Amino acid sequence: MNQSVQTIMIIAGGTGGHIFPGLSVARYLMNHGYKVVWIGSKDRIESELVPVYNIDIKYICIQGLRGKKIYQKLITLLFLIFFAMYQSFKIIRCWKPDIVLSMGGYVSGPSSLVAWLYGIPVIIHEQNRIMGLTNRYVSRFAKKILQGFPNTVNGAITSGNPLRYEILSIPDPVHRLEGRTGPIRVLVVGGSTGSFIFNKVIPEVFGKLFGKLIIWHQSGKKGFNDTIQAYKKLHCNSSNYKVVPFIDNMAHAYSWADVIISRSGALMVSEISYVGLPAIFVPFNYHKDYQQYWNAFQLVKSGSAIIIEQERFTSDYVSIILGNWNRKVLLNMAILSKSLEMSNATQLVAQTVMRYLNGK
């Protein structure tokens, strides 16, 4: 390894909400002459996404602890975590990184701890409005803490959430939405794996408001066939809806949409605000700390979005809301959403790491 090039190790895994911000920062650092390496989990999406960018990635075996019974947690603590630390030790000894940027996910816990034991400085970035369990532990020995939303952690640097590069070129809401006519375009995104409740309710909404909506629906792979059948049973014109397992080009989807219905993961909320889209958020209801609810709270407070708890997410209720929104209302909501965006997060996160390496 060329020792004249400083090596930055990114630790991130599990979901796109951790992976995509990490990739944005990695690309920035690589463009500025740094070597970037990555620790993740082999059975999660980072194993597919990270190599595409010519980033060396190695894997550790780890899984989440939340929601398990006490004896299962103990087994995980005694075996999986210690094994993950052993794997991390071998990886870090091989790569000898100059600094670690932990972007969250369960994978970041053991690897960050081993880096700290090696005397390697650790910087963390918390994407969510409520700090995740793993980052809470890592924050105890982190040299710096960056946060995607204000007031998440006392003393942290508010950077915003690094966004995918392709999102940054989307025109602002006025140029994009003003002058549009026709049915309201509704983008439905239930995360990378889809959402059962969206797949059940949205076809019913489409039927109730037929002729008033055009739907682009990401169903996830598992829910794809059932969702397609739900739309077909309505015997409606198929040109007014499109169901796909996964949307590869989110920039195009965001540009196309007038309004979005989605979960409120941190990255999704940040992207929606940057693009300037009215939103109906349905927070994932199994987080004990209501993490997704608080991610969306600022947009709701601004009047650019609403939150519907999953228990109230019915076709009747959603139909009433969408039926009452016209293009003037949606444009005003989009402008309010855009006013809260933080577009330079990638640069802020990367430069924080670079400055620390350079002793500034």
Swiss-Prot record:
<dbReference type="GO" id="GO:0051301">
    <property type="term" value="P:cell division"/>
</dbReference>
<dbReference type="InterPro" id="IPR006009">
    <property type="entry name" value="GlcNAc_MurG"/>
</dbReference>
<feature type="binding site">
    <location>
        <position position="292"/>
    </location>
    <ligand>
        <name>UDP-N-acetyl-alpha-D-glucosamine</name>
    </ligand>
</feature>
<dbReference type="GO" id="GO:0008360">
    <property type="term" value="P:regulation of cell shape"/>
</dbReference>
<dbReference type="GO" id="GO:0050511">
    <property type="term" value="F:undecaprenyldiphospho-muramoylpentapeptide beta-N-acetylglucosaminyltransferase activity"/>
</dbReference>
<dbReference type="Pfam" id="PF03033">
    <property type="entry name" value="Glyco_transf_28"/>
</dbReference>
<dbReference type="InterPro" id="IPR007235">
    <property type="entry name" value="Glyco_trans_28_C"/>
</dbReference>
<comment type="pathway">
    <text>Cell wall biogenesis; peptidoglycan biosynthesis.</text>
</comment>
<feature type="binding site">
    <location>
        <position position="164"/>
    </location>
    <ligand>
        <name>UDP-N-acetyl-alpha-D-glucosamine</name>
    </ligand>
</feature>
<dbReference type="GO" id="GO:0005886">
    <property type="term" value="C:plasma membrane"/>
</dbReference>
<dbReference type="GO" id="GO:0005975">
    <property type="term" value="P:carbohydrate metabolic process"/>
</dbReference>
<feature type="binding site">
    <location>
        <begin position="15"/>
        <end position="17"/>
    </location>
    <ligand>
        <name>UDP-N-acetyl-alpha-D-glucosamine</name>
    </ligand>
</feature>
<comment type="function">
    <text>Cell wall formation. Catalyzes the transfer of a GlcNAc subunit on undecaprenyl-pyrophosphoryl-MurNAc-pentapeptide (lipid intermediate I) to form undecaprenyl-pyrophosphoryl-MurNAc-(pentapeptide)GlcNAc (lipid intermediate II).</text>
</comment>
<feature type="binding site">
    <location>
        <position position="128"/>
    </location>
    <ligand>
        <name>UDP-N-acetyl-alpha-D-glucosamine</name>
    </ligand>
</feature>
<dbReference type="GO" id="GO:0071555">
    <property type="term" value="P:cell wall organization"/>
</dbReference>
<protein>
    <recommendedName>
        <fullName>UDP-N-acetylglucosamine--N-acetylmuramyl-(pentapeptide) pyrophosphoryl-undecaprenol N-acetylglucosamine transferase</fullName>
        <ecNumber>2.4.1.227</ecNumber>
    </recommendedName>
</protein>
<keyword id="KW-0131">Cell cycle</keyword>
<comment type="similarity">
    <text>Belongs to the glycosyltransferase 28 family. MurG subfamily.</text>
</comment>
<feature type="binding site">
    <location>
        <position position="247"/>
    </location>
    <ligand>
        <name>UDP-N-acetyl-alpha-D-glucosamine</name>
    </ligand>
</feature>
<keyword id="KW-0997">Cell inner membrane</keyword>
<keyword id="KW-0328">Glycosyltransferase</keyword>
<dbReference type="GO" id="GO:0030259">
    <property type="term" value="P:lipid glycosylation"/>
</dbReference>
<dbReference type="GO" id="GO:0009252">
    <property type="term" value="P:peptidoglycan biosynthetic process"/>
</dbReference>
<keyword id="KW-0961">Cell wall biogenesis/degradation</keyword>
<feature type="binding site">
    <location>
        <position position="192"/>
    </location>
    <ligand>
        <name>UDP-N-acetyl-alpha-D-glucosamine</name>
    </ligand>
</feature>
<dbReference type="Pfam" id="PF04101">
    <property type="entry name" value="Glyco_tran_28_C"/>
</dbReference>
<dbReference type="InterPro" id="IPR004276">
    <property type="entry name" value="GlycoTrans_28_N"/>
</dbReference>
<keyword id="KW-0808">Transferase</keyword>
<keyword id="KW-0133">Cell shape</keyword>
<keyword id="KW-1003">Cell membrane</keyword>
<keyword id="KW-0573">Peptidoglycan synthesis</keyword>
<keyword id="KW-0472">Membrane</keyword>
<dbReference type="GO" id="GO:0051991">
    <property type="term" value="F:UDP-N-acetyl-D-glucosamine:N-acetylmuramoyl-L-alanyl-D-glutamyl-meso-2,6-diaminopimelyl-D-alanyl-D-alanine-diphosphoundecaprenol 4-beta-N-acetylglucosaminlytransferase activity"/>
</dbReference>
<keyword id="KW-0132">Cell division</keyword>
